[in-house]
């Protein structure tokens, strides 16, 4: 009986050997495809420890390739010889199922990295409300989905051959042991040794669960290189980390915990308990208008309109000539580093509208927020100054329920381009082409100007710079040889890169034309231009002569942010070079509101000096740009190159917690969302 078990568990061990090799091959492919360096020369110690540590971390799942057949095949097979005879067939079948799981997880990671330049993270959960047919469109048209699916069969055949090879390796014969007691002792030692071996591998070469591999214990040599640190993590452990951590801990907080975090941040001296809800704790008083009250205010949010392309290093690409016409205007005030309120589109738009951070809670999807009376909401507060507010979206506002959420924030009109541009308007899966959308929106603003009253606020949000990049750019005047004649040839002549970069140019041109049209029609207008978020352009520009490195933190995360009005210049920003989405509303009120006007804002205006900006995801000072994902940050300023990276404790964690807990508290108390302060 035990001789059958002895032979069988060795087959389990042979099956187990195949999968760390498969995971290492996947890791090698990932590094080959996405490595930002032209050569690995001088980095081989990093590569070695990346694979070494990744091997042990992968045992979080791979160790079960030994345990499961051990329990389901070898143990019962020891008592049922006929069942044991089927063992290798069952192992092959189970191994192919696990191989398919690894293949799909790896393919998903490769796609995810191409879009977000990161391994699986919480964005996976933020996509829960994404339009499924749109995801399918991207999968098949941008990410070679058909090839991925067709690749399953040859991949499985190759895995079957590999598994059969390992299962065919010679086994150790059961030793001849004289005497029953020594034989039972040997058998017991083998059985216990199998269990011990499982735990030793499962815990990453240790018998202590607390010492098993995790992100914090990646060798520092590897962790300092962000790319190889990410390459260390196998796909299933990465997905496990996403799934085992809730998107937001807000639901598990107590009221006392949240109020204690909010209290240090409030600007109103009254106790939180005396206010209709904690959002009222952020009352501020305007010091007096700095400009003539504009009849039109335009908040323009460009899809992924990032600061990076305004940097001198990337001037040769000439992708932002439309925006630069305003950015370089002497009556423009701009910051050079900014924070978006969210890491993807909807949380940023929600935060800009509502005046509180979405914090990953998808407020626009919650019915309780479709009837909110938040005092911090930008259009609601502008109404107190006599402004009629309109939200213009280049897509369909019903996606994400913004047809419900935007009016609740105080918008008098919510206009959706998929309706007012007509059914035949050219569009991507996200929305109508920016040029068509903005031309039609401009015409409607001009046509209905009198009907909207003397003071108007227009919030416009575009969509076209979004994959898959299928806009026929040549039809709209894009020729890389004419647009970017000074760009390096490996960018200018690369068709794949040009689909991406050309779409950015296309969106910028539409933006510039709209701004010019509105400024000609309404020269006293106040314009605020920003992006919903930035984007890691490493996937597009790395491996080129222009960018022989990965994009740094600032380049990955900083959207554009500037203000334009005939009565301002750069000096209006009090020397500030940093800012964020949540500084926009208070800056507007301090520019236009009369002295004594009360408004509500989490953050101060940019008309007074600020030394830091915080969001749920990032922190920013004049000296550094960091995230709350890890302890690394990018030092800014003279003396530091674009690749500089430092490690240190995360600052402003209390402030971050307070902002997030404010949102969490309001989510848990929907009955407070309609509460208003008595006057």
Language model region names:
Residues 2-250:
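Transmembrane and membrane-interface helices of multi-pass
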Residues 5, 47, 51, 135-139, ...:
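Generic structural signal of hydrophobic/aromatic residues within well-ordered alpha-helices
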Residues 39-46, 114-127, 138-147, 236, ...:
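General structural signal for secondary-structure boundaries
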Residues 244, 248-287:
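Short coil-to-helix leader/linker segments, especially the first N-terminal amphipathic alpha-helix
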Residues 269-679:
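Solvent-exposed soluble domains appended to multi-pass membrane proteins
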